[in-house]
Amino acid sequence: MKVYRTAAITAVWRSMSNLDEYSVKHVNLPSRFLAYILGILDPNSVATISERTRIIDSAIKKINPKCIVEIGAGFSSRQEKFENIKFYELDLPYFQKFKKNVISFEIGKDKLKLKTKDALFIVEGVTMYLQKEQVLSLLKQIRKYNGHILIDFFSKEQSTKKKSMREKLFKILFKLIIKRNYLFDYRIDSIQDGINLFKKSGYKNIKYLEYKIPKTLDVLFYAQL
């Protein structure tokens, strides 16, 4: 299943970065092997996952929220790392096979109905698999609550047309693993486009959180609800 494979890849890459030894326990051996090969072919993607994880975990410590809502949680083990914070882990029903506390939630179909007034919403590694309408709807729903949001997008501005042979091989293998003829759906045009998206959705105190790596499509934002 596609959602399992993408979540498995993220879990393995976090493990390769020595950031998360817990979530990989849900990944079967064939998926671990394939994700590891992908990581070798494209170490910059592993570095992106590593940097994003570090920044988000650091932000959690700084904000110190009473509640965290992870949308598209996958195999994330943050609930185990931050034991004193109440977590709502939202994802497709498929993940309830692995994590009993996962709340069934399908973006574009389900509505957010959480009994929390103030929370940190984390939407990590999700938007690139959505349509624009789904992204806008999700931002609108989250905006109804109080608190903060950390969310990443892929940016067309960061894309490079010239690909190395390793990157081309990675792209072919990734498509085969997730069983799609194309890699991603929604992308913002630029960092400024992302900032404008938040402003139009009613968010404030918007910040672009820059990664300390030379080459990545991924851009991470913080904003207040």
Predicted regions and their residues:
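Short alpha-helix
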Residues: 182-208
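Short amphipathic alpha-helix with an adjacent loop that forms part of the alpha/beta core around
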Residues: 109-117
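Core SAM-dependent methyltransferase catalytic element
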Residues: 210-225
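A short, conserved alpha-helix within the catalytic core of class I
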Residues: 111, 129-145
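Conserved Class I S-adenosyl-L-methionine
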Residues: 163-188
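A conserved beta-strand element that flanks and buttresses the S-adenosyl-L-methionine
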Residues: 121-122
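Rossmann-like AdoMet
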Residues: 1-69, 75-105
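Conserved beta-strand signature within the Rossmann-like core of class I S-adenosyl-L-methionine
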Residues: 143-158
